[in-house]
From Swiss-Prot:
Catalyzes the reversible isomerization of glucose-6-phosphate to fructose-6-phosphate. The active site is at 361 (proton donor), 392, 520. Keywords: Cytoplasm, Gluconeogenesis, Glycolysis, Isomerase. Pathway: Carbohydrate biosynthesis; gluconeogenesis; Carbohydrate degradation; glycolysis; D-glyceraldehyde 3-phosphate and glycerone phosphate from D-glucose: step 2/4. It comes from Acinetobacter baylyi (strain ATCC 33305 / BD413 / ADP1). Its EC number is 5.3.1.9. This is Glucose-6-phosphate isomerase. It is an enzyme of class 5 (isomerase). One of its GO terms (molecular function) is monosaccharide binding. InterPro entries: G6P_Isomerase, G6P_Isomerase_C, Phosphoglucose_isomerase_CS, SIS_dom_sf, SIS_PGI_1, SIS_PGI_2. HAMAP family: G6P_isomerase. The keyword Cytoplasm applies.
Length: 557
């Protein structure tokens, strides 16, 4: 054989990460305007529907090769296997040796795959439903025999953010009750919320829900203690006071009993439910009190529908997978450090706050499952506001600032056209306002994407620099047919599973939160100094010592 025959170079097989790095180098300066010019059918290619919602990611800075490479990345990380593990009874939360089975909270009661699990959950929910109906029918009475008309949910984190967010979002679906019923929320440990609320309430007609997974959270127990003192001062210290005016939700029945909550008023959840995933359980009692039993069942059914979509749908059409992969592309390859969530519906006022916990407490990690430091940036900073209000706050930065930001736009397609609407006599004018919000939602996503090219030709001519729009800010748009218990359940479940997808890519555990633990321990060490039980500051840094001296009035500053 002729040794001088030129050898063809061997074809190098790139890993998905290498392929994405290569694609990033090729496309990092490509503008969304150019992507839309090259692909006239982007909406058809990069939009996925799932019954009564639409997920449009055509304004993301991707093309088909990038999308394919992202899917290959997910496959290389064995995402399918991890999804199967999630929907099992395996201890996927390895640092706490617990399952993560929030999906089980929305299983149909007659589920045949996990019949015992479904029954366990159903038994607690049925007890909750009985309480809800009793309160709605005016049959739940306080210690003096008066009907309960005010319910105060005391919790923090997952025991507060989720129930508050959903109760507010679904206010149009508030059920009629025999007597007017108000649901209020208290979370801050400083007592300011509770102080504002208590003077508006009558002890005789007030019921407190104390929600704490561990029933040891100091924020919650301090508020509960104050509420208890308020009741006892007005009604006395008989055991009937606690029995009639306190409900407990926790994994710890013994601690609830020790605190004074009667076993009949204790509702249980399980260690395999993370706090930020717990609103589907009896932690969601305030939601059920707002939208009723049938509304809560529709809420669970919507989430279960997304569980099935996530579990069974091919990745190119799988909305939570696509949501997660768009975030991976933006964070790890386009180097975007923050992500804004912009709902164009005032009812979603608390949705961003809820997502901040869901995303940043889950994926704000820097240690891989093998104990090594992560190789890539993990969770971006999540922020945002109701879109129309945000337009008058920080959209200036989005449009003309120096920060690159990815955005989620969320809006219902229809509103003010159903029997649940409270102010029917004003429906025509309010429908016009809804259309105004939708037009602004579409306009802002368009301007963020295309910049000056979104303007009319005559508007672009001779624009001074301070009126220029660069564009190329990536976004997705989620349209819901309407904001209802069912679609609200779907929306939350989509983001839950998006978070899980990203945790698999980053190889981190999204179900623990060790970063929040030590701060609470240090606070417990400092409290005796502030209340005068200890005076030893020697173990503290100079800054903390100085601040304590100021607080105690001992500083010469």
């Amino acid at each position: 054989m002729n040794k001088n025959i030129e050898q063809f170079p061997r074809k190098t097989t790139l890993t998905p990460q290498q392929k994405l790095e290569q694609l990033m180098e090729q496309h990092k300066t490509v503008h969304l305007t150019e992507l839309f010019d090259k692909e006239q059918d982007r909406f058809a290619k990069y939009c996925v529907g799932c019954e009564d919602l639409v997920f449009d990611f055509s304004k993301q800075r991707i093309n088909q090769p990038i999308l394919d490479a992202l899917v290959q990345l997910a496959e290389s990380k064995q995402l399918n296997k991890w999804i199967d593990t999630l929907f099992s009874q395996n201890k996927i939360n390895y640092t706490e040796q617990r399952e993560a089975m929030h999906w089980a909270l929305r299983l149909p009661a007659d589920n045949q795959v996990y019949p015992e699990l479904a029954k366990q959950v159903s038994d607690q929910l049925e007890r909750m439903y009985q309480l809800v109906n009793k309160i709605h029918e005016g049959q739940y009475r306080g210690a003096t025999g008066e009907v309960i008309q005010d319910v105060v949910n005391i919790g923090v984190g997952g025991s507060d953010l989720g129930p508050l967010m959903v109760s507010h979002a679904l206010s149009d679906f508030k059920v009629k009750t025999a007597k007017p019923l108000n649901i209020r929320f208290v979370s801050t440990m400083d007592g300011s919320q509770l102080s504002d609320i208590l003077h508006q309430l009558r002890p005789e007609t007030t019921l407190f829900i104390v929600s704490s997974k561990s029933f040891s959270t100091i924020d919650t127990l301090s508020n509960a203690h104050t509420a208890r003192k308020w009741l006892e001062k007005a009604l006395g210290r008989e055991s009937s006071i606690l029995k009639s005016h306190f409900i407990g939700v926790s994994t710890k029945p013994d601690k609830m009993t020790e605190w004074g909550i009667h076993p009949d008023n204790q509702f249980l959840l399980w260690d395999w439910v993370g706090g930020r995933y717990s609103l589907w359980s009896c932690i969601g009692l305030p939601i059920a009190l707002t939208i009723g039993v049938e509304g809560f069942k529709a809420f669970l059914a919507g989430a279960h529908g997304i569980d099935e979509h996530f579990r069974t749908t091919e990745f190119h059409q799988n909305i939570p997978v696509l949501m997660g992969l768009m975030g991976i592309w933006n964070t790890n390859y386009l180097n975007l450090k923050t992500h804004a969530v912009l709902p164009y519906d005032g009812r979603l006022k608390y949705f961003t706050s809820y997502l901040q916990q869901l995303e940043m407490e889950s994926n704000g990690k820097s240690t891989q499952r093998n104990g090594q430091k992560v190789e890539n940036t993990t969770c971006p900073i999540v922020w945002g506001e109701v879109g129309p209000n945000a337009q008058h706050a920080f959209y200036q930065l989005l449009h003309q600032g120096t920060q690159k930001v990815s955005c989620d736009f969320i809006a219902p397609m229809h509103r003010y056209n159903a029997n649940h609407f409270t102010y029917v006599e004003n429906a025509d004018a309010l429908i016009d306002q809804h259309l105004l919000a939708l037009s602004n939602c579409l306009a802002q996503s368009r301007l963020l994407a295309f910049g000056n090219d979104a303007l009319k030709v005559d508007q672009r001519e001779q624009l001074p620099a301070y009126k220029q729009y660069e564009g190329n800010q990536p976004s997705t748009t989620m349209l819901l047919k309407e904001l209802s218990p069912r679609t609200m359940g779907k929306l939350i479940a989509l983001y839950e599973h998006k978070v899980f997808v990203q945790s698999v890519i980053w190889d981190i555990n999204p179900f623990d939160q060790w970063g929040v633990e030590k701060g609470k321990e240090i606070a417990n060490d400092l409290l005796p100094i502030l209340n005068g039980e200890s005076s030893d500051l020697s173990h503290l840094d100079d800054s903390t010592q100085g601040l304590i001296q100021f607080l105690l009035g001992k500083s010469n500053g």
